[in-house]
Amino acid sequence: MSSNSTPEKVTAEHVLWYIPNKIGYVRVITAALSFFVMKNHPTAFTWLYSTSCLLDALDGTMARKYNQVSSLGAVLDMVTDRSSTAGLMCFLCVQYPQWCVFFQLMLGLDITSHYMHMYASLSAGKTSHKSVGEGESRLLHLYYTRRDVLFTICAFNELFYAGLYLQLFSNSATFGKWTTIISFPGYVFKQTANVVQLKRAALILADNDAKNANEKNKTY
């Protein structure tokens, strides 16, 4: 009887409460709370912000383990990443006015490259923006297909900004300085990957537009 039973119909409410999506909601809450304590409580901020970042690895694992991969989860994951980093960078713009333009450019690159990369991947019929063949881009293939590489580079990217943040407080200035120095190579790799995926996304979209234009021309 159990082998022939009809699987329960999945509803929107089920998807909303998938285990990885619940983890995603916790990520949003901890990231938001970290903004409230960011100005005066570096220890509390570090714990909350780190929790939000570390849960990023857990939600993907749970999605695969329980077969609960969803578009909602993928989008929630990406916008939480971008929003939490943006919040920290906004604070750094205020505290490091001499580097404000640099932070603005890096934030723009981060948001633009990830949005265009996801949109272009979906437009090309791919189920995930992380599906990058080695022939398309060796760097992005390494970055997106190796979970250890993806986790390490993303961690270094966050640690670079976190190190700059910690340098603002006397009790953690030295630790913050070394955190920034050690994470810098990974940070450079991340920005390079952003540039590469931005270029790749633009080419994919342009190629799709060219194909559509040629198809329309055939009708005339």
UniProtKB/Swiss-Prot annotation:
Annotated a CDP-1,2-diacyl-sn-glycerol binding sites: 60, 64, 70
Binding residues annotated for Mg(2+) 1, in chain numbering: 56, 59, 77
Lyase as UniProt keyword: no
Organism from which the protein derives: Saccharomyces cerevisiae (strain ATCC 204508 / S288c)
Gene Ontology biological process terms, A to Z: phosphatidylinositol biosynthetic process
Cytoplasmic face residues: 1-20, 67-75, 120-145, 192-220
Superkingdom in the source lineage: Eukaryota
Name assigned to this protein: CDP-diacylglycerol--inositol 3-phosphatidyltransferase
pH-linked activity: Optimum pH is 8.
Topological category with respect to the lipid bilayer: Multi-pass membrane protein
UniProt GO molecular function: CDP-diacylglycerol-inositol 3-phosphatidyltransferase activity; metal ion binding
